[in-house]
């Protein structure tokens, strides 16, 4: 859906691929306005939202909840441990139920890639779907907060050298970011173990060893090692990973003074990044968490715009 009167209008948010550049820039701009506290909040108390997380989450779940409460929405609690999911209820039937009860927005995280396809195509489900992460597929709200953090720092994307490093093949963060960052004009590089890289990345950027290019980077985006998706197949120890692929203190010193470090968290300290660097001067990991609330407020507003259009 379009941008109308400088307001993004969305029915759902499920994939970065479905957003135009104008919508992306509109959402991160709106997030910045919310952060600056100069945007009046409409009375949204007649709207209901629910967060349905079928995978573990701290940042995404709780920042959506914070955003929902900042936006004045009524939050309907949902706990997978006490729901009919444990009786065999399907995801589709769970969302169908929430929609029938009058929930306007369902924020969903689920291990199945593209789980949302049947939900957004169903004429029986009237709730808007916000994808909080679908397996190793997409993570649009994380991508938008990453973009907001980068834009805050540099004021543009064109020409920035950005390396996405780590567990690439299992990362929905990598896949969401590489698509839109390339579209916005950034130079993308990938790094990490060969076994966690695939040819699908070649269309978006070049594979390089981290030590070959670290002194040229504007942004080093580290990825979490996703142990839960490996089935015990990693062929190296935590210490070996940190030495060969992680951000060590020695590598940190090679970064440009203006470079920034990002990580979607949770962080495996002394694996992806040295413990001493998580809150270092060039790190923006805490800023990413903070920006997550504001960009998710912008997402919710855009969905509400779509529901009232």
Curated annotation (Swiss-Prot):
UniProt GO BP: 'de novo' pyrimidine nucleobase biosynthetic process; 'de novo' UMP biosynthetic process; amino acid metabolic process
Residue sites binding L-aspartate per the record: 87, 172, 224
Gene3D superfamilies assigned: Aspartate/ornithine carbamoyltransferase
Keyword Transferase among UniProt keywords: yes
Biological or metabolic pathway of the protein: Pyrimidine metabolism; UMP biosynthesis via de novo pathway; (S)-dihydroorotate from bicarbonate: step 2/3
Enzyme Commission code: 2.1.3.2
UniProt binding sites for carbamoyl phosphate: 59-60, 109, 139, 142, 265-266
UniProt GO molecular function: amino acid binding; aspartate carbamoyltransferase activity
InterPro entries in the cross-refs: Asp/Orn_carbamoyltranf_P-bd (IPR006132), Asp/Orn_carbamoylTrfase (IPR006130), Asp/Orn_carbamoylTrfase_sf (IPR036901), Asp_carbamoyltransf (IPR002082), Asp_carbamoyltransf_Asp/Orn-bd (IPR006131)
Superkingdom assignment: Bacteria
Catalysis: reaction(s): carbamoyl phosphate + L-aspartate = N-carbamoyl-L-aspartate + phosphate + H(+)
Signal sequence coordinates: none
Keyword terms: Pyrimidine biosynthesis, Transferase
Top-level class of the enzyme under EC nomenclature: transferase
GO CC term, one of those recorded: cytosol
Record's function text: Catalyzes the condensation of carbamoyl phosphate and aspartate to form carbamoyl aspartate and inorganic phosphate, the committed step in the de novo pyrimidine nucleotide biosynthesis pathway.
Family to which this protein belongs: Belongs to the aspartate/ornithine carbamoyltransferase superfamily. ATCase family.
Subunit structure: Heterododecamer (2C3:3R2) of six catalytic PyrB chains organized as two trimers (C3), and six regulatory PyrI chains organized as three dimers (R2).
Record protein name field: Aspartate carbamoyltransferase catalytic subunit
